[in-house]
């Protein structure tokens, strides 16, 4: 079996902005909060980190500064996906050079690669680096869904360390876990974290843990320990917040939530716009 290089909750960190620029001092505050909460891995420049509207130079500086700040206290997983294989491979090499411990690489989006294209893409990207690569399957955003039968072939790529599964299909994830029991799977959806871990998943790459890192990690660790009654109860308590964090497109609500709890991360870059007043009031009512 490929041993998972982390288990439990990993936070898909928001990218804080100030005056339109990356707010590095705030990023360090966010990282410190995650470490203090017991989070052992953080994704920088994932979907929640607004990777689509960050330049490569900004991404590499975020990777470098994040790793320099956390040292060995936390794994830095760099989001380096692209729908251009050459670009994804080049950015992945640069991220490794900037100190990233691992990479999160989304499936090529928009151009709708075939299964053979997906295999070639991940083989090329993983072959360009010497650190673990996590595939990221999120068909609602990319327009492509990795078929279950392709995962067995993907799992043979030496440093392809597993997959963040955000297809939202529990039946599909159940088939994946049964067909490829030696291939690590992390839930990409907070509301399905316990279900995925009950099927053999290794944890969750979480939006929720930006706001509630202690509680998210407690839920994940209970599930990993086989205490699914406790894990399910903890998740039930968190479901109202999870629903609020996804009442509009991610990361609009989570950035609003961070400001409400005292971490001013700024707004999102266009084309994402501020949270509606109606939903913001619901979020305030829950958090304040």
Task: Please give the residue ranges for each predicted region.
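C-terminal alpha-helical cap/extension of soluble enzyme domains
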Residues: 8-15, 33, 37-39, 198-201, ...
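Short secondary-structure transition/capping segments
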Residues: 54-57, 90, 115-118, 146-148, ...
